[in-house]
């Protein structure tokens, strides 16, 4: 028997389906998402939670004429399946396949690229303003999760939208979670829910009737408004959004397609800013994901029946795990150490720290800007905060790094996870810019370990340093080296010669590139090319003395970094040589080009860009033949 899903090639195909057929389709979509994610990994639980919401939106609104803006994109899989990408869905998150996020280049139904949180309201408001300037009358809808509502930009968008009072629909998808459980006053506030969509129509009718009467009628209207505000404020979160200038409708069962459809049909007739509060269950339809939504938020391959995660090859602890263990040990001995995360306690390895030192652990929500300045405040009072954060998310707080940390030379440590290419999440999540944007900041120390043991010592170095310091490390397992129990700081700006070759080529490798550089050197040795390999350790401050010492002896310097070449470590070396007036040495920079790197497994991307051992050996072989 054929699936209804196989007959859905565009959102228009949903409009002729009955509510019962849409219910069947919802389950078919869930099964498709589970099947593909079990092989490819992906953001399973968020997408399972919004299937009915997605179908109702596409049934009522006419995409792409009507613009549906999805926040983050974690919940976009059902949207992709009903917008013409069913036949390619099996390629989700693979090299050359469809993205796990929204991509304008992929489909006209993806009206705004997404990957980071809290941007949808601002983007949708811009689309609505453009519509009005052009004299069009299409609808614009932003779909944002309650987790994304912990980000400040969401409120900047709400504030501006309420001021402009444009024809804009915001759907708040409330599953009481972002990645882990939500934190903060907003989460508590949203749990106070009771009202319905008929209130909007009723209020308009009453206002029209009383407003048309004499002064007594208008006074009654004022009293009624005050009474409504007082009572609603006791029971609902609607007051918050109405204070921003939005009409508030909800909460609505986000899995009731009929109710959702009815509500969206009514809202289509409104011409002002409306917020619809929808309640959903993260992971719905897959029992393991419903039971452990955080585990299945972003998950690797798993058994599609039991939900058991497919374990990779055994071996070394991940860099994230080693970081968490080392930080906990350091905090055991130093009461000044506190840990901060932006809604990712498990993803950044802080689970053991939060259990051991709950009073010194802070989850700030998806609020990176606040997190950095919060850390600065702690540091200003003598504490040693460690902000564990993914490289791509730290970008969101650049001015806070400059203004609130580095300007005052405050001792804040940034533990930058997921540096380099991260894999299938693609360009929004690769950590390929941190060396460039961090080394430009005065007072900032920037380190990258060659292995997980060196990571421990660099963490100790950063915490002991009386100023800002960053340690960047990759996603994935370490190299399996022994872990020292006693940790000591590394002298700032010192590198380490790991292989002293007799040839004229010196390789300066950063962090995760040290291992492939050594492998390449071993390969080339058998071909008569004897490389010197240096573990740089510090991108800032540079080991000026060592680098300059090789200038007179080496004909070629090769810098290798898992970062974009623009402004990175190789650029720092060139700047040093230019400042010193040094010539007579060829400098070749290996890294990522001036482009956004596509999705793919880490090993696939490193191979494609010549940054695995084979690629490095091949490029140096070519240089040596010149």
Curated annotation (Swiss-Prot):
Mg(2+) binds at residues 146, 175. GO terms for molecular function: 1-deoxy-D-xylulose-5-phosphate synthase activity; magnesium ion binding; thiamine pyrophosphate binding. GO terms for biological process: 1-deoxy-D-xylulose 5-phosphate biosynthetic process; isopentenyl diphosphate biosynthetic process, methylerythritol 4-phosphate pathway; terpenoid biosynthetic process; thiamine biosynthetic process. PROSITE patterns: TRANSKETOLASE_1, TRANSKETOLASE_2. Its cofactor is Mg(2+); thiamine diphosphate. Transmembrane segments: none annotated. Homodimer. NCBIfam families: dxs, PRK05444.2-2. Catalyzes the acyloin condensation reaction between C atoms 2 and 3 of pyruvate and glyceraldehyde 3-phosphate to yield 1-deoxy-D-xylulose-5-phosphate (DXP). Belongs to the transketolase family. DXPS subfamily. This is 1-deoxy-D-xylulose-5-phosphate synthase 2. The lineage of its organism: Bacteria, Pseudomonadati, Thermodesulfobacteriota, Desulfuromonadia, Geobacterales.
